[in-house]
A protein has these predicted regions:
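Non-catalytic, mostly N-terminal accessory regions of nucleic-acid modification and defense proteins
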Residues: 1-186
Length: 186
């Protein structure tokens, strides 16, 4: 089984697609939410059909909001769910509608997950990537990264995020390792 360095490097290779439309310190605006999104996609894959069936059964009924989320979370066997018929494979299969479908896919998540992507202001980044003609490439490359817990256990996933965040911090503040003592600051 590959270690966290393998997956971190794989994700950094995808970040190279952002070069041009994004400066390196801005890569985290895309790479963190896309990594989270792909992980959630992989986690929910085994129960996708069950969640969709439960959503269809409950749709239009008396349950909505938190109550509906609770039932769908139970169907997913997680503290979150996605009731969209979309997933990364389906997104990859429709390049002409990638922006619309990606936004729709994110809106299919339970509120607790949608809040994460709202915090990232990710819809603006989706639009920016589409305008730069790299959205499909980024989604397609992430689709090829298997972040399922059977492949990447939670502890290893934590190390991947830690590695990515450390790398982004280094890009944001490249001079942090060069203290200015005396001469240059004075």
């Amino acid at each position: 089984m590959p270690d966290h360095s393998y997956f971190s490097n794989l994700i950094w290779q995808i970040a190279d697609l952002l070069r041009g439309p994004y400066r390196p310190p801005q890569y985290e605006r895309v790479m963190l939410p896309m990594t989270v999104l792909r992980r959630f996609d992989c986690v929910l894959a085994p129960t996708k059909a069950k969640v969709l069936a439960e959503f269809e059964r409950r749709k239009g009924g008396r349950l909505e909001g938190d109550a509906l989320d609770t039932h769908l979370n139970n169907a997913a066997g997680q503290r979150f769910h996605n009731h969209s018929a979309l997933d990364f494979e389906r997104l990859k299969g429709d390049p002409d509608n990638i922006e619309k479908h990606l936004v729709s896919y994110i809106k299919g998540f339970s509120k607790n997950v949608r809040d994460i992507f709202d915090f990232f202001e990710f819809e603006a980044e989706i639009e920016r990537m589409r305008e730069a003609n790299i959205l499909y490439l980024v989604v397609s490359k992430f689709c090829d990264v298997d972040l399922h817990p059977n492949t990447v256990p939670n502890e290893q996933m934590g190390l991947i995020f830690e590695n990515l965040i450390r790398h982004f911090n280094e890009l944001t503040n490249p001079l942090q390792d060069f203290p200015l003592h005396g001469g240059l600051a004075g």
